[in-house]
Amino acid sequence: MRYVAHGAADEFLYAVMIRACAESGEPEPERALDLFTEMTIDKQISPTTYTYNAVILTCARSKKFALEAFRLAREMLNSHRDAYGKTPSRLRPDNATYRALLEAAKRIGDLPRARWILAQMTSDAQTFQEGERPVYIDERVMTHFFHTYASYRPPFRRDAVSYVQKDEAEDQNFGPLDNASENRVEATDISYRPSVPQSRQEIIKEVTALWGRILEDRRDVMTDNQNHSSPYHLVFGHVSLTSTLLNAYMAVHYIHSPPSVAYKVYANLFEPLRLRRDAFTYVLALEAYAKGRRTSKEELRYALSVARNIWKDWRQLEDVGVSQMSTHPNSEGVDARVVERAWSAMMRLLTM
């Protein structure tokens, strides 16, 4: 009866319904996949990039279905190629596609896939042709990328390495492996280096270099400096410096840097760029020092002293935000949930 009273749903309507599954408070990937199957299989409606973006985003926002997002992306690229191996223009990935895939990568801490996506976006930006939707790296892309670094867990932990005493090693008989040292490949050989960071130090080194490149490209854009021989010059020229982007960069330091280094970055990051710290800046910092692992009383005292400094600035912002909440909702990013998180983090620190 419903289908008699109303016209048949078209591709755009299905895309809107699927996108709604991602925008709800709790993503509904199962319902989105059911709608996508109904559209493509039952109704024989050909999907477009917009439809794929909707279903990929819905799956990406659920950790359980994050890998399904990558499967759908492969289907989008491979199952509709023509005889020459080219994907039709209506199914070529755009910025929304890559952002959705990065959201899936950060959900599961999949840094190799995130790095591949960024490299692919860089390549697509260089090979952009007239009539195609442009692909470029902006601040939303880099926010997801930094969050992926924050959620990535390196395989190597120095404190987990077990050492063998020299005398014990000499007593052991390793048989055919005794001569292995003669054919050992030096660790400095670049061909044997891992493709992703293997320790927290390598993560911070890589992220710091990436952040420096963003600032360099932004500076060249502002000064209109085009004198550069690299084809990848200004690849980060579309990245706007926002508090959200800086918060994502700080999240990497909170997870992988020592507390003292993270606070030094926090204290010196915003003012030189003439950006204000928003509510999430303070909440993320307080939660980082409340949840961080501390192995000594000195580290606990340091975390508490840093948190007190952050708390003073937060209270000033909170007072302004709460006073304006009735007339300007979400003023300065302050809402009831953010206030709750800030107070919970500080109380947790004080009770340690």
Question: Where are each of the predicted segments found?
Answer:
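A basic, Ser/Thr-enriched alpha-helical scaffold prevalent
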Residues: 1-352
